[in-house]
Design a protein with these regions (language model features):
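Flexible, charged surface loops at secondary-structure boundaries
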Residues: 20-25, 51-52, 95-99
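Catalytic core of membrane glycerolipid acyltransferases/transacylases, capturing the structured
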Residues: 24-82
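Helix-to-loop junction immediately C-terminal to a conserved catalytic motif
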Residues: 1-34
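Short amphipathic alpha-helical face segments that pack within enzyme cores
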Residues: 5, 39-42, 122-126
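Glycine-rich, highly charged phosphate/nucleotide-binding loops
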Residues: 9-15, 80-92
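Short glycine/serine/proline-enriched coil/turn segments at secondary-structure junctions
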Residues: 21-22, 65-67, 147-151
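Non-catalytic C-terminal accessory region of glycerolipid acyltransferases
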Residues: 88-221
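Alpha-helical membrane-targeting segments
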Residues: 1-11, 63-72, 199-221
Length: 221
């Protein structure tokens, strides 16, 4: 997946304080918008490859793409409640075995156009996850893909604080996620941390300065 990201993006950026303030011994449910094909890859790169936390994602089409199992994909077919229940239990066991593990969760349920924006999400979804995994903290992570003056897409991350639903309302997850996503879309600030340098642009690879004497002679007087 690292190779796939490197060939698909000009760079992957983090906006905001780095490294993020995450608890070492609490499971995370990473709540992210799902606007781009590579969102799952990007979250894996951030949480597992960069921050070193084991990760999982519930995947509706796992039967079609079981090759993602080694990187934490678990089957979650919409028409098979028994398999979904097994995945829920397997996730709980992973959280117990690895207290720093992260579950990627897309509240929209499906891939959506960025034009749709963030939400509204049914807060009962977050409340249900909290009942299943009461020790887990919810971490709203916004993803945005832009060209940003580059010849290839640039992926950007920005995150809110970790939320404990024992103390905060489930609706706070959507509020923080929307706020961070809007900041990413409107930001003109440089990233605080470069997570990956991917495809180089032609301007970075090529220089024709050696032809300067020739073309100078072709300029009009």
């Amino acid at each position: 997946m690292r190779w796939d990201l490197r060939r698909s993006f000009q760079r992957i950026e983090w906006h905001g304080p780095w490294p993020p303030a995450l608890p070492e011994a609490r499971p995370l449910i990473v709540c992210a918008n799902h606007h781009h094909f590579y969102d799952g890859h990007l979250l894996w790169y951030l949480l597992t490859d960069t921050l070193g936390r084991p990760s999982m994602v519930w995947m509706q089409e796992w039967n079609r793409f079981p090759l993602f199992a080694p990187v934490g994909a678990l089957p979650f077919p919409p028409d098979d409640p028994q398999t979904r229940a097994t995945t829920v239990r397997r996730t709980a066991r992973q959280f117990q075995a690895h207290p720093d593990a992260a579950l990627f969760y897309f509240p929209s349920g499906t891939l959506q156009s960025p034009n749709v924006g963030i939400g509204p999400y049914a807060v009962e979804r977050f409340a249900r996850l909290h009942r299943l995994y009461p020790d887990a903290l919810f971490w709203p992570v916004a993803l945005h893909v832009t060209w940003d003056g580059a010849p290839h897409p640039v992926a950007q991350f920005q995150a809110g604080p970790c939320l404990d639903l024992e103390r905060q309302a489930p609706g706070a997850i959507e509020t923080h996620l929307r706020r961070q996503w809007r900041r990413l879309r409107e930001t003109t600030a440089a990233p605080t941390h470069l997570l990956m340098r991917g495809r180089t642009s032609p301007a970075d690879r090529w220089s024709f300065a050696w032809t300067l004497p020739l073309f100078k002679r072709l300029l009009p007087p």
